[in-house]
């Protein structure tokens, strides 16, 4: 074999937004991609299985006729995410992962995690469910240079999560 052709690749980080904004872009993504990881940082964020399922229905309704596009839904982790919600997500085939947004680091992250230990019960459930953890890896410490925020996140937060949850898919 000398050549590989990807006819319908996957998009592993897609912001579709919602409403009219989503309707204006989802068709283009669906024509180019077979599947996509749908980012949950809407306003309000997609924090529950029922919200993810409703958002997926909105996406599917906006797709062009006969589209085979498969949106893979993601839950937005908060300090209040409970293991039962993760277990329910693990049982829902349309939900692929959950995402950690540190509070205040990016668009619509105000509801994000204030301290990673607050989501340890949810991470334990994710490890049991074999659900991937997606990460917006950045700290908000004003003492940390903007160009160092990702590396500091890895050193101070992610390394600890990897150590504490060795079976978690990150």
Predicted features by range, described:
Residues 17-21, 50-51, 81, 114, ...:
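Short secondary-structure boundary/capping elements
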Residues 25, 55, 122:
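Aromatic/hydrophobic pocket-lining residues that form π-stacking "cages" and hydrophobic walls in ligand
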Residues 47-55, 83-86:
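Metal-dependent catalytic neighborhoods of phosphoester/phosphodiester hydrolases
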Residues 52-60, 157:
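Short, well-ordered amphipathic alpha-helices
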């Amino acid at each position: 074999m000398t050549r590989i052709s990807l006819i319908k690749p996957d998009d592993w980080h897609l912001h579709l937004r919602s409403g009219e904004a989503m309707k204006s872009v989802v068709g283009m993504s669906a024509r180019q991609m077979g599947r996509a990881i749908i980012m949950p940082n809407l306003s309000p964020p997609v924090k529950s299985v029922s919200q993810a399922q409703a958002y997926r229905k909105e996406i599917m309704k906006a797709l062009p006729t006969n589209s085979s596009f498969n949106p893979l839904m993601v839950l937005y982790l908060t300090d209040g995410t409970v293991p039962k919600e993760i277990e329910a997500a693990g049982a829902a085939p349309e939900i692929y992962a959950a995402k950690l947004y540190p509070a205040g680091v990016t668009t619509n992250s105000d509801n994000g995690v204030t301290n990673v230990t607050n989501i340890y019960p949810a991470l334990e459930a994710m490890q049991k469910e074999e659900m991937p953890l997606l990460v917006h890896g950045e700290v908000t410490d004003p003492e940390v240079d903007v160009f160092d925020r990702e590396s500091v996140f890895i050193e101070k937060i992610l390394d600890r999560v990897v150590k504490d949850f060795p079976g978690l898919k990150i």
